[in-house]
Amino acid sequence: QPANVDHLLTAHGLMMSEILTNAGRFRDKAVGIQKGKEVHHVAPPAHQVSGLMADLTQWLKQAKDHPLITSSVFHYEFEFIHPFSDGNGRMGRLWQTLILSQWHPLFLSLPLESVIKDHQQQYYQALEDADQQADSTPFIHFMLSVIAQTLALNAPVNATLNAPVNIEEMKTPEAILHLL
């Protein structure tokens, strides 16, 4: 269940057990994101992580927005909190896929992670833009674009094989729903 903190911790433990000594536990130290010597994001203090993650999963349980939006907001907030000492990006992307797959099982087989990797600089830029604006909208737009592109490349239900795809027109939840 994506709205269950214990499931999140268990998944992190399974994913990171060969890499981290504290896999499956929230971080107990300050962390930030640096590019060279420049700090781009300072995560909330470690003593706040447990409460922030409880708040985030509670929000997820009660979210009324479309799953495309909800999953993107969750992903952004998760990355902002940066709850683990390592593996936050992997976990955030995995959890977004999990949220989306509960809405539509097709997302279990879509390579969102691969498309994000192909656009890694834009991914980090969208996170940074959202941080600077104190608004998750830039990140939501980026993720909708990635989802639309992934669907267009892997599940072109209503298109012929040679039809051009306009990614800009596919960034809305309605356009993505049409692909499903």
PLM feature spans:
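FIC/Doc superfamily catalytic core
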Residues: Q1-L180
